[in-house]
């Protein structure tokens, strides 16, 4: 069972530089940097549905990895994610993962 005491600090991104230096930083830092880059490239263009865009970029790989981890067991996957199974099924269908 998932340890509820774990914080978002457990979600890190590991990178290896050309000089073989390994760095780890929180996932939120990578998301923030990606958003800063995206917003910097807009050149004054209007943006709609940014929230949905970001969620889709995170949600789909999350669903994929959780379903792999639970070997396709939707009940376990839903419990792990803290959502009900019906919601999980809708999300899987949304991304064509059913």
From Swiss-Prot:
One Pfam family per UniProt? HTH_8
Q: Which family does the similarity line name?
A: Belongs to the transcriptional regulatory Fis family.
Q: What does this protein do?
A: Activates ribosomal RNA transcription. Plays a direct role in upstream activation of rRNA promoters.
* Record's keyword terms, sorted: Activator, DNA-binding, Transcription, Transcription regulation
Q: Which residues form each disulfide bond in the chain?
A: none
The UniProt entry, under InterPro entries, shows: Fis_DNA-bd, Homeodomain-like_sf, HTH_Fis, Trans_regulatory_Fis
Subunit (UniProt): Homodimer.
Q: Which gene encodes it?
A: fis
GO molecular function list: DNA-binding transcription factor activity; sequence-specific DNA binding
DNA-binding recorded as keyword? yes
**What is this protein's record name?**
DNA-binding protein Fis
Q: Identify the DNA-binding region of this protein by residue numbers.
A: 74-93
Organism (species): Aliivibrio fischeri (strain ATCC 700601 / ES114)
Entries under PANTHER family matching the protein: DNA-BINDING PROTEIN FIS
Source organism phylogeny: Bacteria, Pseudomonadati, Pseudomonadota, Gammaproteobacteria, Vibrionales
